[in-house]
Each structure stands twice: as structure tokens, then as C-alpha cells.
Design a protein with these regions (language model features):
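Short pre-active-site segment immediately N-terminal to the catalytic Zn-binding motif
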Residues: 337-341, 395-415
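Catalytic zinc-binding patch centered on the HExxH motif and its immediate surroundings
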Residues: 337-339, 376-396
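Catalytic Zn2+-binding segment of zinc metalloproteases
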Residues: 419-423
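Carboxylate/His-rich catalytic cores and anion/metal-binding grooves
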Residues: 340-364
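N-terminal secretory signal peptides that target proteins for export/translocation
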Residues: 1-2
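A well-structured
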Residues: 16, 20-334, 345
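Bacterial N-terminal signal peptides
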Residues: 5-15
């Protein structure tokens, strides 16, 4: 019952954080129907899927070499540095492989080829984790003063000081080599719930439909939530909201089990590493006390009155008795403004002029590069992952995924993701 209850919260969060649609057409367009200028180009990562295969084969032959450092990791500074350099090379390669495969898949989650490619990269990463399971336990067998001495002898190691310190802070939760290897191998199972949910939502969900302000029937999708939740017509907002939840309601039992699996996975790893609970495992790994988390929730709960007052004022302004979830983003004015993607680009540039001109126009050049070199995937298409994100990896320009629908929030999202990309 607990999981059936919290699944509603999970669904609501998913809906509220998704972005928007590419057009006002009845059906969501296929990816092939989207103009190429609005789609990211991944050929600068790998020229083709075949080139991706070549690099995957290379790293599969490379990563076993990490086993050569076992038993002599801290024999001298040069050996430690060599191990770090090899680890960086492997992770840079895997990051590049993941960047290509995962972004290709997220553009269309129904693509079975990219589903397989993502899984293959994940499998190599897990195998690499098993090969390097000895690494941290072996390092922690020595006192930290050994590493301090190494850093004094070889200045190139100094740049990894924080990595070393973090490892020693986590020492109480680092297991033996054998146990670390088992946990790494179990990692393949930990992501099954999330993967199953993503594929189910992209391929198996049968969305409801609703009629817009003009009576035109539209097929619902997560991408349409952002636009129609801001409709001035309450009937449209309510019908859209109900249509959004049709597939979730039909899959409630399945989703409850998937979420249960995700939660139990977190509990398993927390217990295995000797944390008090999964909350401590998540917080302590980032150097944050669980008290901060709990105090934040307590503080919010103790100061909800302004939010309740806002809801009362908004309900009164909208002329309704009580605000409901689909009224949360309703505009107070009786009209809405839509912005083309090109208008959004200009608005962002105009708004950021003082920043864009700093440092000899560095940010200006960066923004133009993002706009002009197919580094942004703009509109929703069938199978595309909902929401927005910025994706980056070593030695490659970042990429941004949107589901742009022309709302002011979409303009803000573009600016937000550009900020992540520049950072």
C-alpha cells in the first residue's frame, strides 16, 4: 500500500517537470518529420555507429590493463600516476561512448539499436568496475601520509588531492576487494527498474486525449503538459490533466513494483556499505549531514502558510472556489503568448548581453556555437525522452535536449540549460 500511495507523488513530479511540444498538431511528430536544423548532430562524437563500434572494441582491449597495478599501486608515485592516467583514458572513452549512445536513445526511446548500444556500454563499465575493485581498498591499506609524500615527490599528483581525501573520508564504507567486486557486478541489476520504466513510458503507454480551446482533439503526451497546463480555459486544463494520467492509472500496479525495486536497491547498497539507512548513504557521499536534509523538510513544513495564502489568492483571482493541481500554472491574465524557438534564442541573447560581452565575448561565442552547430535538440517527437537536460563529457562540446513548445517557461529552460552547458 505504501508504494501504491507514493507512486501518485512520483507521477505528479514527473508530469510537472516535463517540458513541452513541438507543434499544435493532433499527433506528436515522428523524429524523421522534425527539420534537421532543430536536431542535434552527434557525428562530431562518432562519425557513424560503425565508428562507435571500433572505439568500443578498443576500450574493451584497454581496460583489462588496469589489473597490472594490483599489488603495487602505492609502490611509488610514478606507478600511482600511471594507474590514474590509464583510468582517465578508459573513463574518457566510456564517457564518449555513453554520450553518443544515450543521447541517440533519448531522442527516440523506441529505437532498439540504441537500447542495445546503451546496455553494451553499461556492461563494459560494470566489467571495468569489477577489474578495478581492488583499487580503493588497496589504496586505503596505507596511511594517508603515504599519499601526501607522493604528492610532494610528484607535483602532477597534487591535482588529485581531493579524490584521495574523499576516498579516505569514505573509508568506513569501503569494503574488501571481493565485496567491492560483487557490488559492482550487482550494479547491472540496480538500474533495471528505471530502465523498464523509461521503455514502458516510451513504447507501451497509450495516452488519453483531450480537446483544446478550439475543440480540436489532441493526443496527450508528457511534452504537451507544459503548454496546456497554462491554458486560460479551465476545462482544457482539467481534461489535459486527466488525459495525462490515463496510462499511469492503467499501469499503477506495474509502476508500484518498479518503484519498490528501486527503493529496495537503495536499501541494499546502504546496508551493504554499513550506512544507517539509504538517506545517510546518499547524503554522506556528498558530505552532507542527514540533519540538514531533515531540518530543511521541517523548515518547509513549518512555513507553508505563505503558500496556502498564495493558493487562496490565486483561486479568488481565477474565480474558483478551490485551487486544484491543474490550476497551479494557470495564467492570471486572459491571454497567453507563444514564442517561436528563434524568438526564444534572441530573448536569451538580449537578456544576457552584459554577461555575453564579458571576457572578450567568450559567452557570446559559446552561445552562438550552441545555436549554430546543431548542439541543441529542440522539439518533442514520438519516443523522445521528456523534460530537458544538458549532457557533457570530456573533450566534446556539451549538448542540450529540450522539448520546446513556445511558452515563457520554455524560454527560461533554454537559458537555464545554456547556463549548465557553459559551466
Amino acid at each position: 500500500m505504501y508504494f501504491r500511495a507514493i507512486i501518485f507523488y512520483f507521477i505528479f513530479i514527473m508530469a510537472c517537470t516535463t517540458n513541452n511540444e513541438s507543434s499544435a498538431s493532433t499527433e506528436i511528430p515522428l523524429r524523421s518529420e522534425i527539420d534537421s536544423k532543430y536536431k542535434w548532430d552527434l557525428t562530431s562524437v562518432f562519425e557513424s555507429d560503425e565508428a562507435w563500434e571500433v572505439e568500443l572494441d578498443r576500450v574493451k582491449n584497454l581496460y583489462p590493463n588496469m589489473s597490472e597495478f594490483k599489488g603495487k599501486l602505492l609502490s611509488n608515485p610514478e606507478t600511482l600516476l600511471s594507474s590514474i592516467r590509464l583510468d582517465e583514458e578508459v573513463n574518457m572513452s566510456l564517457g564518449k561512448l555513453w554520450h553518443y549512445a544515450s543521447n541517440s536513445l533519448n531522442a527516440d526511446l523506441t529505437n532498439e539499436k540504441y537500447q542495445e548500444m546503451v546496455q553494451r556500454v553499461r556492461n563494459v563499465w560494470i566489467k571495468y568496475g569489477a577489474v578495478t575493485a581492488y583499487y580503493t581498498p588497496e589504496m586505503l591499506e596505507s596511511d594517508y601520509s603515504v599519499l601526501e609524500g607522493f604528492m610532494n615527490e610528484n607535483s602532477e599528483l597534487k591535482q588529485y588531492e581531493k579524490v584521495f581525501k574523499d576516498a579516505y573520508i569514505a573509508k568506513p564504507h569501503i569494503l574488501s576487494e571481493k565485496e567491492e567486486k560483487l557490488l559492482t557486478m550487482a550494479g547491472k541489476l540496480s538500474g533495471v527498474s528505471n530502465e523498464a520504466y523509461d521503455i514502458m513510458r516510451a513504447t507501451d503507454f497509450e495516452w488519453g486525449s483531450f480537446k483544446d480551446e478550439n475543440g480540436k482533439e489532441l493526443t496527450m503526451s508528457p511534452g504537451r503538459y507544459g503548454k496546456y497546463t497554462k491554458s486560460t480555459d479551465r476545462r482544457v486544463r482539467e481534461d489535459m490533466y486527466k488525459a495525462l494520467y490515463v496510462p499511469f492509472k492503467n499501469s499503477l500496479n506495474t509502476m508500484s513494483v518498479l518503484m519498490k525495486g528501486n527503493v529496495e536497491g537503495n536499501i541494499f547498497y546502504a546496508n551493504a556499505r554499513g550506512y544507517e539507512n539509504s538517506l545517510e548513504a546518499k547524503m554522506k557521499g556528498s558530505g552532507i549531514s542527514t540533519d540538514i536534509y531533515k531540518n530543511l523538510i521541517k523548515s518547509v513544513n513549518n512555513n507553508l502558510q505563505p503558500l496556502h495564502r498564495w493558493a487562496e489568492i490565486k483561486a479568488k483571482t481565477l474565480g474558483i472556489e478551490k485551487i486544484k493541481p491543474f490550476d497551479t500554472y494557470a495564467p492570471l491574465a486572459d491571454f497567453t503568448i507563444e514564442y517561436t524557438y528563434e524568438e526564444a534564442q534572441k530573448i536569451v541573447v538580449d537578456a544576457l548581453q552584459p554577461l555575453l560581452q564579458a571576457n572578450e565575448g567568450e559567452l557570446q561565442k559559446f552561445t552562438e556555437k550552441m545555436y549554430n552547430e546543431n548542439l541543441i535538440d529542440v522539439f518533442e517527437n514520438k519516443g523522445k525522452e521528456s523534460g530537458a537536460y544538458m549532457s557533457s563529457t570530456w573533450d566534446l562540446p556539451p549538448r542540450i535536449k529540450l522539448n520546446y513548445a513556445g511558452t515563457l517557461d520554455d524560454v527560461f529552460t533554454l537559458a537555464h540549460e545554456l547556463g549548465h552547458a557553459y559551466h
